[in-house]
């Protein structure tokens, strides 16, 4: 598991805020993907039993992963934050902190509190900046729990007095992090994203969101995949502001660079669902990026 976390750290080390010529300070940020923190007691099992595939994932996967790997994984995260050099200035989490699917409003509140209790237990001593994931708002009462439990905790952990939504910015050192919520019904969300990026004097700019901007596997999952106009606008904003995309959702590790008419976009996609701490070498490595994703996996229909 140490090696798994080292991979995440090494990805960010290459993006450290420093320049020897300008004698700037070296800093690091620890990047986490989906976690899907899950305790069986946080589910209405009668409700969940009506959804066989969700029941399987909860009982056979995420609750098991949480029990078997989260205690050690969280200790490693805490240790890296304390000892890693250059020093880690923040932990960045790309959404799906919890599994969701609690089954009732009461259980949704309970699940949200359990997830943040797990984060608090790490006692990180640095900002914990997170974005909204689809599982964080899935199930009866989940959206209300996000408003009531998630947003106050997100504000506290990131060092903000309060948050009205999952669209917010945090600046640390010379680095800007803009959390973007594509599910927000605010029609001016993209304009606000552009304003946040353009209005910052930070040298390094990151856009944090759960779903990838650039699809990287045969499922072709990416934000705004059913809204070409918004997708083009998002690509233009990110590329023109030379921002780097940080995302998750696919439970994969990926680094890609895509050319657009407005410039290149670099995207880093990570995963923190640890199924087996003893798997230290990737089983499948894809070095070429192109349309062969679709033809190589005909069983998948791109969405």
Regions found by a protein language model. Give the residues of each.
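Bacterial N-terminal signal peptides
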Residues: 6-14
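Positively charged n-region of N-terminal signal peptides that target proteins for export
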Residues: 1-4
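Short, solvent-exposed loop/turn elements at domain surfaces
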Residues: 27-29, 37-44, 186-189, 216, ...
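Extended active-site neighborhood of metal-dependent phosphoesterases/phosphodiesterases
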Residues: 51-56, 101-204, 224-237, 244, ...
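Histidine-centered catalytic micro-motifs
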Residues: 208-213, 243-253
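Active-site glycine-centered loops adjacent to acidic/histidine catalytic or metal-binding residues
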Residues: 34, 95-96, 133-134, 210, ...
């Amino acid at each position: 598991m140490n090696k798994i976390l080292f991979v995440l750290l090494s990805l960010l080390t290459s993006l450290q805020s420093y320049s020897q010529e300008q004698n700037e300070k070296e800093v690091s940020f620890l990047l986490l993907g989906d976690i899907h923190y899950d305790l069986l007691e946080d589910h209405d099992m009668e409700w969940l039993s009506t959804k066989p595939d969700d029941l399987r994932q909860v009982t056979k996967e995420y609750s098991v992963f949480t029990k078997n790997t989260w205690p050690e994984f969280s200790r490693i995260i805490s240790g890296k934050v304390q000892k890693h050099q250059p020093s880690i200035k923040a932990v960045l989490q790309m959404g799906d902190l919890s599994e969701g699917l609690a089954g009732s409003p009461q259980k949704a509140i309970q699940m949200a509190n359990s997830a943040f209790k797990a984060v608090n237990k790490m006692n990180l001593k640095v900002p914990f900046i997170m974005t909204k994931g689809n599982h964080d708002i899935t199930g009866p009462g989940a959206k209300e729990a996000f408003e009531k439990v998630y947003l106050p905790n997100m504000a506290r952990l990131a060092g903000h007095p309060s948050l009205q939504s999952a669209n917010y910015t945090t600046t640390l050192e010379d680095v800007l992090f803009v959390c973007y919520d594509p599910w927000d019904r605010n029609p001016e969300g993209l304009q606000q994203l552009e304003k946040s990026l353009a209005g910052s004097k930070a040298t390094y700019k990151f856009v944090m969101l759960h779903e990838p901007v650039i699809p990287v596997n045969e499922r072709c999952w990416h934000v705004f995949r059913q809204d070409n106009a918004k997708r083009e606008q998002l690509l233009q904003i990110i590329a023109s502001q030379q921002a780097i995309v940080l995302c998750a959702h696919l439970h994969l590790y990926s680094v890609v660079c895509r050319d657009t008419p407005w410039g290149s976009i670099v995207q880093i996609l990570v995963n923190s669902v640890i199924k087996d701490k003893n798997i230290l070498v990737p089983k499948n490595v894809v070095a070429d990026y192109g349309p062969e994703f679709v033809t190589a996996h005909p069983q998948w229909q791109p969405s």
